[in-house]
């Protein structure tokens, strides 16, 4: 299985694993959503709809803020997984954040995040996690490519929806299209950081 391992310098006691699944079947997505709502511990992951995520920096910013809030007891959500989703949202409404950034049965792509204590990170734990995710998400049509900025911008993000969510339809961008992803990243992160101010 392909995944990104993120270590936060300020929080050496935790390790973040990020997986991308594409082509996940609608019944599987429906099952994931139902299990999350029921609180099934086998689904103790952060599942994200990547249509509103513009870059890895945008995703990392949300993860960092969620871990920071968790470590200092300032979480607005009940769980760290929901806090990651909430920190992607530009507005102060957890239910709206779950609706926009959580599992969407209409989107066959899914970013899956697991935050683990570094002390529990070893090859056996990664293999168990790998096997578990394959069991709950794999279908004949699903794939597990490496998550990077190119695949996010070219294949996953829906720019029209992203601009609507972050209210960027009237934003002026430089004429150089090569840095559009960078400009949108800065605006999206800024909107999240200023939420509620």
Swiss-Prot record:
Q: Which UniProt keywords apply?
A: Activator, Chromosome, Nucleus, Telomere, Transcription, Transcription regulation, tRNA processing
- Could you tell me where this protein is found in the cell? Nucleus; Chromosome, Telomere
Q: Which domain of life is it from?
A: Eukaryota
Entry GO terms, CC: chromosome, telomeric region; cytosol; EKC/KEOPS complex; nucleus
Query: Which InterPro entries does the entry mention?
Result: CGI121/TPRKB, CGI121/TPRKB_sf
**According to its UniProt record, where is this protein mainly located?**
nucleus
Family statement drawn from the similarity comment of this UniProt entry: Belongs to the CGI121/TPRKB family.
Q: What does this protein do?
A: Component of the EKC/KEOPS complex that is required for the formation of a threonylcarbamoyl group on adenosine at position 37 (t(6)A37) in tRNAs that read codons beginning with adenine. The complex is probably involved in the transfer of the threonylcarbamoyl moiety of threonylcarbamoyl-AMP (TC-AMP) to the N6 group of A37. CGI121 acts as an allosteric effector that regulates the t(6)A activity of the complex. The EKC/KEOPS complex also promotes both telomere uncapping and telomere elongation. The complex is required for efficient recruitment of transcriptional coactivators.
What is said about its interaction partners and assembly? Component of the EKC/KEOPS complex composed of at least BUD32, CGI121, GON7, KAE1 and PCC1; the whole complex dimerizes.
Q: What is this protein called?
A: EKC/KEOPS complex subunit CGI121
Q: What is the lineage of its organism?
A: Eukaryota, Fungi, Dikarya, Ascomycota, Saccharomycotina
